[in-house]
Curated annotation (Swiss-Prot):
Pathway recorded for this protein: Metabolic intermediate biosynthesis; chorismate biosynthesis; chorismate from D-erythrose 4-phosphate and phosphoenolpyruvate: step 4/7
Enzyme Commission numbers on file: 1.1.1.25
Protein known as: Shikimate dehydrogenase (NADP(+))
Name of the gene this protein is made from: aroE
Phylogenetic classification of the source organism: Bacteria, Pseudomonadati, Pseudomonadota, Alphaproteobacteria, Caulobacterales
PANTHER family (UniProt xref): BIFUNCTIONAL 3-DEHYDROQUINATE DEHYDRATASE_SHIKIMATE DEHYDROGENASE, CHLOROPLASTIC, SHIKIMATE DEHYDROGENASE
Length: 287
């Protein structure tokens, strides 16, 4: 039986459109139950054009904070009263918290999730060991590039079909980042310590990325931010080439950890195997 929600229950959640598929409530509520914390985490689906109104209604302290997903990450950043350096660098917020005085604080934990997943599933990998290639030039790519630069990557190669978009992302972080057209992916992969897919290609049966992963060094790590399916065509190709791989579910869990700390003032309990719970849920949703 779930514990009752009381006047002391700490409420947090995730806001997106759509959001019914989100695994965040499963992850956070499992941690809450394991830790014995009087808290709850729920999903919200605000109208796509009324997110600011939705957030303003929460400034009075109704909830502790929100994780923010598509399509609200950029607007969440724009309406915040205080913006963290991580969110500013990523040009997007995936975490907002509400202060007692009504202020909204914006942060971005995607980079924490990215680096945490790489460290967990590719032990020994280091951001500062060599160039890293990032596929895509959207919000997820911006967050990845910012995190990699902050972690000491000597060069980040942004590979995108539309070169101008890659150039815009590269320009935001300076000379460490370089833009590459998609048809030059093989050159971008040469010598890379990691190749990271920050696009939605391969999600839920959509076409996967057709890129020359065989151009990567044998020691390279290949990561996909997509977690449904867990092993995307991109990761399957990497595994066929005997490259180490990192999946998007691990990133989701790792980026949730600092959010849990911000909402509930505690670290996620080590004994809660939220990955196993999430995998079971994903298997149940498989077509």
């Amino acid at each position: 039986m779930k514990p009752p929600i009381t006047g002391r229950t700490v409420v947090a959640g995730v806001a997106g459109q759509p959001v019914a598929h989100s695994l965040s409530p499963l992850i956070h509520n499992a941690w809450l139950a394991a830790a014995g914390i009087d808290g709850v985490y729920v999903a919200f689906a605000p109208d796509a054009d009324r997110f600011e109104v939705f957030v303003d209604g929460l400034r009075g302290g109704a909830i502790r904070g929100l994780n923010v997903t598509i399509p609200f990450k950029e607007v969440a950043l724009s309406i915040a009263d205080v913006v963290s350096p991580r969110a500013e660098a990523a040009a997007a917020a995936n975490l907002i918290t509400f202060e007692a005085d009504g202020r909204v604080l914006a942060d971005n934990t995607d980079g924490v999730g990215l680096l945490g997943a790489l460290q967990a599933q590719a032990p020994g990998w280091r951001a500062d060991a060599g160039p890293v290639a990032v596929l895509g030039a959207g919000g997820a790519a911006r967050g990845a590039v910012a995190a990699l630069v902050a972690a000491g990557a000597p060069q980040v190669r942004i590979v995108n079909r539309t070169l101008a978009k890659a150039e815009a992302v590269a320009g935001a972080v300076g000379r460490i980042a370089v833009a590459c057209p998609l048809d030059a992916a093989a050159q971008a992969f040469e010598g890379a310590t990691a190749v990271i897919n920050a696009t939605s290609a391969g999600l839920s049966g959509s076409p996967g990325l057709d890129v020359p992963l065989e151009a990567t060094p044998e020691t390279a790590v290949v990561m996909d931010m997509v977690y449904k399916p867990l092993v995307t065509p991109f990761l399957q190709r990497a595994q066929d080439l005997r490259r180490r791989t990192v999946d998007g579910l691990e990133m989701l869990i790792r980026q949730a950890e600092p959010s849990f700390q911000a909402f509930y003032g505690a670290n996620p309990p080590a004994g809660a195997d939220v990955r196993a719970l999430a995998l079971k849920t994903l298997e149940g949703r498989a077509p």
